[in-house]
Amino acid sequence: ADVGVAMGIKGTEVTKEAADMVLTDDNFATIVQAVKNGRNVYTNIKKAIHYLLSCNIGEILTIFCATVFHFHQMPLVPVQLLWLNLVTDSLPALALGVEPVEEGVMDQPPRNAHESLFTGGFAFRLAWQGVMVGLLTLAAYFLGEYVLSDPGEAHAAANTMAFATLTLCQLFHAFDVRSERSSLFHIGVFSNPAMNKAFLIGLTMQLAVLCVPPLQVVFSTVPMSPLEWAVVLALAITPVVVCELAKAVSRGRTRRPARAEKVEPACARR
């Protein structure tokens, strides 16, 4: 057997020492709940890694493009990158670690113990989502630099728009990562209290950095116009829309083969 099980009440000390699992209540039904919790722990770790890596890919892509294509100035300054990694990355990642158990987690087949974390399209998903976040940040920078701002304040406004877009993208993106396949509206937008708190704390702190004059000096930000705010919010919410559409397409592809398998036996009987 892969796992040795011993009874915690009636079992001997020898069997408890030799066993991999000890049932403290002598109830085999406890194993089901233990497996469920174990799968949830693994899934939540995977979600946190997904979130952190995809966000970091977005940050790296932004700086990489600015370096390779010789931008006049960097879209983000060092203190802003530190802020992103210490505040807006960490709080949602911690909240993903306590995500409630997803519906249907026990319907999945057992996972191979030697399976890589990056199988099943996981690496591709976090890569394209990270690229999307990076491109949206660059779009905000170019709009602020060349379209929306006055020439004298172009770079400061572009830097602020890029910083705000990247931060809000990451905060909104945390909600996308809560489920690999289920819609955010199906699992409940506010069903994880820890995520709600992380989002509100991160949003409040980011608004302070963008709007409070002493913090604006520290983080090299400037006040944004209503139009610039509207553009930032539209870009920041884009990952939610795109990821929800991708999930819907993935669910549709899964349902079609399942329906075909159900219809095939009926056709065979005829």
Where are these regions (language model features)?
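Acidic, divalent-metal-coordinating active-site segment for phosphoryl/phosphodiester hydrolysis
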Residues: 1
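Membrane-embedded transport module
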Residues: 8-182
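C-terminal transmembrane module of polytopic membrane proteins
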Residues: 97, 164-270
